[in-house]
């Protein structure tokens, strides 16, 4: 594993994005300004000016879908090392049993951490920063001039920055200080304006292949080259972190020769907000890296052994000239390791996060979009607490089981109040998730999944003498290509087979090995002829690094074939012959963490933006109160259009009444549905929005809901993309009181024990010969069925939900199914079936003799599993004869065709034609 750690991972950053696939840059859909994008599409003729609001939205969705389909997004914006860091933090979170204070990359907990950010401003020959041709049509963040001092205040001021109409808006520094309880801050400098060598469209123009920006990274490199010659910047001030621990000493707070946090501002509106005068040729705001370290020639760092003692840059974020704090703080959140929380593929009408988090739509909150970004989700604050340390959350952790013994009453303060309890985590029993079904039988061998694994299974194997010996098995694998490897070993050395590769781009020394994806179960074979006549150690191992934990390796039905004769080694059924060190037997499912995070939201501090959300030129609000987040780690995305009601993160909507547009009858998007997701004692504020073509959205159900119970349906059947499917464990959360200003609420958490309703076992069977196919129609009205046990009446059993099986003998059999629910209650259903061997077709044949034109024919037909019960002859003149033999006079000499049809005692028919020559 040291080889992986020091060689493979050290090269990961420099090479991860070097292939042609990543010549373009990603898009961040979390910073989309839909209204401005629609205006751009109208302005450029892609949408008719008189199009209806519905048609405009459809056109916008198509525009975004094209970018998603052709380009790349989501975690593609993170390099290998950044993903590894995130994985380490998540591992710490999963292991916490209480208000644990582990910090992975933090300073001493008593210190306030201030990170250094360097902002570079760069314009274009055809679009200077002081002559950018912007108008109110392009942006609400319109200034006469965009001086460097504006960005200095926007990012680093402790007093805010001046808005276009003289307002005082929150700076990025103030946002992070508020969210962290003043335990984390940023400082830095805005340098420039520099000037690019080419016109703006060269950098932001979209690739024909991906429809994403072609040369945005080239613009970043040009800005860095000019930075290297700028005498006003002391680069050593911006190298105080070793973000990826390049020297492996565990110290993340030391120089590494790389600029810590780099922000680029270009002289146009971003494409995500219409692109200003450039339209689609503007750069789309994003977080990314430069593919390989870019060295700032002529500079001198404090790390002489790296980059020839010069500074370099790698990670960056890029924002538009008119950026507000929301976009900057969102992209900087990525730089701290946070993923996007929205539906990164736009699969449906929106995920149930929306404006509730800056890492979704909350970056665009405010009367002027982006000037009042909303707070982080509880999940994001939990992540930052464990990665940075400080006071992002002041939380209590409870388990569902301890609530059964004693209910708890908690005063939960608004999420912006970090000095008092502002989050409650409720852990649940592990969630059982359907996985990879075995290739055959009930079990297969599984490597398990995870970071930094060194898993193995082994056993002695005696290989008989022979000329050709082959190990054969079924394999299913999904392994991070070029980074993680599974291997077959003989006496500790890896051997090659038909599913292995010799590709080893990072010189790990682990090949031949299995890497990449099999796309289903495949037949594997490995030549063991060199060890014929010997007893060897057969082993499988699975070696992974950090960052991206893919499914791993499954192995089933291992056989040894010597000179054509096969013997079973192990099929994972019964007691295994393998010794396990990390590998396990797997029955086609795995377990995942899931839990609730309780957060109190208000319209105070950074959450003022929840009261000022602009849609269709009108303001709406997200309601204050108790927000219940449900985290489900069995999912890695929020693609709710593909799995409605399910995803890795979302809020439980307290108001299950769907909002519908009056004119079209269309169910509104999730951003409108979850406006009232909070549980509260106070009725909701009214909502009424009217579009330009008179379509009205009005919320007619404003009654408060103060109680959550996990036995209720929160899947939002009318608007399923906004719903959350939760599991019933008896969790009940009651809001007892809340302050008039919504600064806190008093919450009672309990586990309610109710009499379990037993499951109902039911099934249907389809019999074909000796084979039987089952359809399981069992149900559990108040929970989930967690196990199935079939008895086929012949000594065979199965734990699959809907198995298919075969009998070896005909006869009557009683098939029994026993189902057990998540509370331990069971039910049994039995059905008797009759099976028979498949009927063999009768074999038709005949002989004949003739005397002149007199012909006698007789059937010699047989039936191997019965008897012939009907014989029919069709003569040349069309007449029909029946019986095993007949005599008839044929009309002429020559060649004649006689058709013989025979039927057996089970109705099978065979017909042949007999040639008669007279």
From Swiss-Prot:
Keywords: Autocatalytic cleavage, Calcium, Cytolysis, Hydrolase, Metal-binding, Metalloprotease, Protease, Repeat, Secreted, Signal, Virulence, Zinc. Its EC number is 3.4.24.-. Residues 1-23 form the signal peptide. CDD domains: PKD (cd00146). It comes from the Bacteria. It is found in: Secreted. Ca(2+) binds at residues 757, 782, 821, 825. SUPFAM superfamilies: Metalloproteases ('zincins'), catalytic domain (SSF55486), PKD domain (SSF49299). The active site is at 331. Residues 758-835, 855-918 form the PKD domain. GO terms for molecular function: metal ion binding; metallopeptidase activity. Zn(2+) binds at residues 330, 334. Belongs to the peptidase M6 family. Metalloprotease that exhibits a cytotoxic effect leading to cell death. In host tissues, it could play a role in pathogenesis by modulating the stability of the extracellular matrix components such as fibronectin and fibrinogen. Also able to cleave plasminogen. This is Pre-pro-metalloprotease PrtV. It comes from Vibrio cholerae serotype O1 (strain M66-2). The gene is prtV.
